[in-house]
Structures are given as C-alpha cells and as structure tokens.
C-alpha cells in the first residue's frame, strides 16, 4: 500500500486497506491492466481500491471509503453489468 493512500485518506489505515484487499468481494480488470476491487475492512466498511499486480507483488495505489457510484458503475460495466454491492 503506497503511503500516499493514507496521506490522502487519513480515515483509512494500512491495516484497513490490507484487510479490505484480503476480503475482496468484487473486482474487475481495466484495459490498462490495473485492477479495481471492493473489499471489506476490519471495521465493516466497503473500501474501493485500485492496484496493479506484477508477479507476486501487488501495489495498491488508491483506496477510498465508501466506494463511489462512479467506481461501482465502472466495475459493473467491466464485469458485464452484473450488479455490485
């Protein structure tokens, strides 16, 4: 998790983001190769995340709670309009 995530969103800790990543409920890959995901943190909050995976390394460069409508719509579109949370 990049430090800038917590700097921009002090309501999220690194532990919150890692917990949300480990409990992803819905995800989709963008054409760019970046992944979008929504997971549940340890406090029961839905967290939107953007990340890239390179081999065994995952870099989460964006996280926000609660997920925005725009974020959810994009995941729906990428997943073929299956409804997310």
Positions of PLM-derived features:
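Ribonuclease/tRNase effector modules and their secretory precursors
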Residues: 1-85
């Amino acid at each position: 998790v990049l430090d800038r995530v917590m700097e921009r969103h002090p309501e999220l800790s690194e532990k919150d983001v890692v917990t949300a990543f480990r409990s992803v409920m819905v995800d989709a890959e963008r054409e760019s190769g970046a992944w979008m995901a929504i997971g549940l943190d340890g406090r029961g909050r839905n967290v939107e995340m953007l990340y890239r995976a390179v081999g065994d390394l995952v870099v989460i460069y964006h996280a926000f709670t609660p997920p925005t409508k725009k974020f959810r719509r994009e995941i729906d579109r990428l997943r073929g309009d299956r409804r997310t949370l």
